[in-house]
Amino acid sequence: MPRRRLIYVPFWATYVFLYTPIIVLVVMSFNAGKSPYVFEGLSLKWYGELAGNDTIRQGLVNTLIVAVGTTVLSTVLGTLLAVGMARHTRSRLLDALGLLPAVLPDLVLAIGLLVFYATIKMTLGLHSVILAHTVFGMAFVAAVVRTRLTHADTSLEEASRDLGASPLATFTRITLPTLAPGIAAGALLAFTLSIDEFVIAFFTAAPTEPTLPIVIYSMVRFGVTPEINALATILLAVSFTVIIVAQRMTRLTESLS
Amino acid sequence: MSRIRYTRHLPAATVAAGLVLALAACGGSSSTSADGAAPSAAAEQLNPNADLSKQSLTITIWDGYSPKDLADQVKKKLGFELKTAIHDTNETAMAKLTANADSGIDVAFVSGQYAQALNEQGLLEPLHSELIPNLANLYPEAAQLSFDKGNKFSVPYTWGTTGICYRTDLVKTPPTSWNDLLNPSADLKGKVTMMTTERWLALPALKQLGLSINTTDDKQLAQAKDLLLKAKQGGMLYDDTTFGAKLEKGEAALVEAWDGWCPTTNPKIKFVVPKEGSDLWSDTMVIMKTSKNKEAAHAFINYILDPAVHSWVGENILYKVPNKAAMDLLIKNNQDLLAKNTPLQMTPAELLKGESIVDLGEASTKYTRLATEISANQ
Amino acid sequence: MTAKHDIAPPGAPPGAPPGAPAGPSTGRPSRRSRGLGTAAARLAFLGPGLGYLIVLLLVPLALVLSYTVFRRGRFGGVVYEWTLENFTRLFDPLYFDVVLSSVKTATLTTLAALLIGYPTAYVIAGLPRKWKTIALIAVVMPFWTNFLIRVYAWIILLSGPGLVNEALTGIGLIDKPLQLLYNQGTIVTGLLYSYLPLMILPLYAAIERLDPQLREASANLGARPARTFWSVTFPLTVPGVLTGCVFVFVPCLGNFVIPEILGGGRSIMVGNLIRDQFLKARDWPFGSTLALAVIAVLVVLLFLQAWASRVYGGTEGRRA
């Protein structure tokens, strides 16, 4: 029936649209020549150049530090917040506050923090980016963990409380283990969001400590060498691996729980 | 750390100096003295025999604007660590230098008018010329730049002018006037670019009209705006950073360019200063007041002014340096390069014919508005 | 750019797209019979996170808000003198038109995303389980490489000697390369490319939840497929549509990178204006006022969303 097939046109168009640029990037990263348009033969030379690029390496190190810091902070604060919001309050206002960082345009958050840091005269550095990223990192961890909490069975917690366990014991022995997959997913989310975040880092990083997206931004502005394509390809490969591993892990944890 | 916070623990004289400084910073519109001498009241005592190996230095500079191994050179010759931050435009550098109490930057590379603005804000350390003996290598003209006469707070690193850079094979008649850029022939549509950095966006139009590039007259700026809007409607594209590469790839045929960014080593590419005249710009080195490594900062600037070091700029990125000793060395060693590169051949006297861009204080917002009017126009 | 809007939680089950709780479809937990615990426990759980959000989110936003009524300092920062000048300037046609045209661009992008995203989500929801997962991951995958690099790829694709022109010339549609870069269309393309998945995921979640029996019932009652779609399927997915629209519209409105890289400096959006007030013009109060305008647009949008989902709400097929 032609009408049925018609709906497949936008479906396939979506994937062509999403993947054409990426295929071009990957192919061009193996280009022997410098032109971004003409393929002049297979070569790994841009990967070599990339390995020798100190600015990119430094950016990568900074990004990883920021992402790890953000993940740790966001996971702890976000999990507590999620449990607190689900079990210890019914305030709609708090709900809204918890979600605000997720719906606020990043530019608005970025200038807010820039103004704030300037007002308290805080010296910028990687710590200022970590603090900034945690604002939204925490919100996303809280959101993911809450989804899990809402579906979780509360009878165990109630039983624990009825049997006289302290709130802390109930939390560490019962709630946390139930939430583990949600927390892991939230942490991974905070990590990946932080790694690719540009706008907030752009406004809150010290000029001496740019994160990788900032380095890439200044490189793109100066016209791009195929080094950038090589970098994109590597990021893509790493991400792909992470996705596969994450999928396996969730399946594993789900089958265990 | 903010200077003002320091003052609590310092003797009365310094407190007074700090107050002057604070007032100068807050006063805003009150005074914009041309020689910028006012804030230098707070000069600090520096120790010429300080142990530099105990200091370290952070600079901010444009990408590719200094030798890749500069850090190694500095470590070997001066004995301290050098860290380099990159900024892509003056504005980015300014934002970072002015947004916070301490940016962590010791030495910044910014264009002259921005150095002037930083100084007026009281953010710069007055130079201790006795710690920079190599200042003697500079052309006498280098102390005549109107944003900082006498090099009180800035040392010029490079200087040059703005003109038209074009492909001889794609442009039928060689351009001679700013009008050739603003109003190009029909076959060049979509292949002409201008810069968007406020002052250089206005420059071609102002010069075309025979006006000063430092004008603050609303009527004159309105005339310039008309010309620039017409140019945009004619299909003008805007590019501050990649016009050289676009010319080489043939994606652009005729662009507004700083002399050093025009890739004239390519035989098909030429640079011309339009007959209506142009600017004299200078990128300078300045020392931040917040620096805790001021001795190292002076030693670094002195090292850059060494002829063998400074001539790297001319040899590798084709910018002229205001350093006579370095230019002499460049001319001696690079006859071929010089023959091919017309901008490099310009003398200080020729350069001084250009008008220096100076900071306009409050009136600089007029240029910001002009730039917004051009880019917002559909 | 808005990385925080970018990625689906990798471990989250299908049906829980990123930030889904922001959407109208997730209500409060329905079963809640226990007490709220002790005050101490409440403080221990809620204290740190809320304290953090107050200091690093509410205070900064309040600062931005308060800056709108002060004068600019010459070198950035603010002079504490009252003025309404910033608001007068906001309604200066120069700036107001940019705000309007940004709203237009964001709306256009959102509609385009809906047009292409809805059928895509619809098809995905009907796929066998295994393919469903693969199709969903494939939607999210592009987000896993740097946003800026992906945008840059469009320059390679759309430039004069680029692939798109080559292809068009190759099939004989045109004989001379088109100027595809540096116009309004390029910006919309870039925005659409960056945020399309944020439309597809909530739509998928909404469609997937539909009870297929509803459609069957409608068909059994003699409705044609088109009629079934418009009178049964679509209304039930409106909350998902609205969520998707908000997810796409918000990051589009605040964007400044895409207009800059793909716009060739020929057009700007309100994001560019805000960025420039802070990083170029050093006019923080006016930058704050522009940010306030963006927030105002969003508040209106969120109210619209809440209203619309209430109108369509209450119908079956949605999780209560």
Predicted segments — roles?
Chain B
Residues T60-K68, G104-I105, F109-E251:
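Extracytoplasmic ligand-binding site segments that recognize negatively charged/polar headgroups
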Residues T347-Q378:
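Conserved C-terminal helix/tail region of periplasmic/extracytoplasmic solute-binding proteins
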